């Protein structure tokens, strides 16, 4: 499967995924994922986390390429209040539904008969960042054979989870890391679908005698569709109204001076989202053209652009 999302063990360490619960609170079923203890705290073996996280990326990319639907379920209100800006990004994409309210029992197993307002699409997969607060979701998805993906901490029971990922489920950093992986895999799945015909056309290039010409042909088409993919997704963000929300009104106010204080304290999390999604792939000439078309005047645009890359 073609995938351009790369993660490293250093990113897992920076996200505090190696930390577990106190040694007094642990589940023997997670003993396989533990490497030891340090200061009465269980420590996860990041080799398993790294291997399963890469499989998680491939699974997500295949899910989105085949037009699947994903539910993000989180009942941990403490994490939701601290990271509420994260979830505004997922309201833009029809492939993802985020559920942050209290889980109604029978939402999956009795989907037809639940009388509350339900999401429009039934899920093909479910992502649960914390099993302790969402064990009803895991049990219902296990009953009706929907693949569930969950971050399994040292106190959790991974027996009913279809795709367990060992790690720290009580940290905001680990939650932010996995949500950024989901956002990146969604963007790259759109890139895969837009350039699918390239892989079909490679088999038709056997008539070319030289391998050099064949490689140049494929490389040029990849570059062309990479620019097209970026342009389509950036225009999608503008059309969907993501930049027209209150926290992004500074982009639409003419000749407004942007200071470091307003960016770092009011719009830090949305800038982190955009910078992580478009890092190393965003061409600022395309961004500037869209800004000029929308007649957006930002006085300190260079500071805004550098901050997007420096924050992560």
From Swiss-Prot:
GO terms for biological process: translation. GO terms for molecular function: structural constituent of ribosome. One of its GO terms (cellular component) is mitochondrial small ribosomal subunit. It is found in: Mitochondrion. Its main location: mitochondrion. Keywords: Mitochondrion, Ribonucleoprotein, Ribosomal protein. It comes from the Eukaryota. Belongs to the universal ribosomal protein uS2 family. This is Small ribosomal subunit protein uS2m. It comes from Acanthamoeba castellanii. The gene is RPS2.
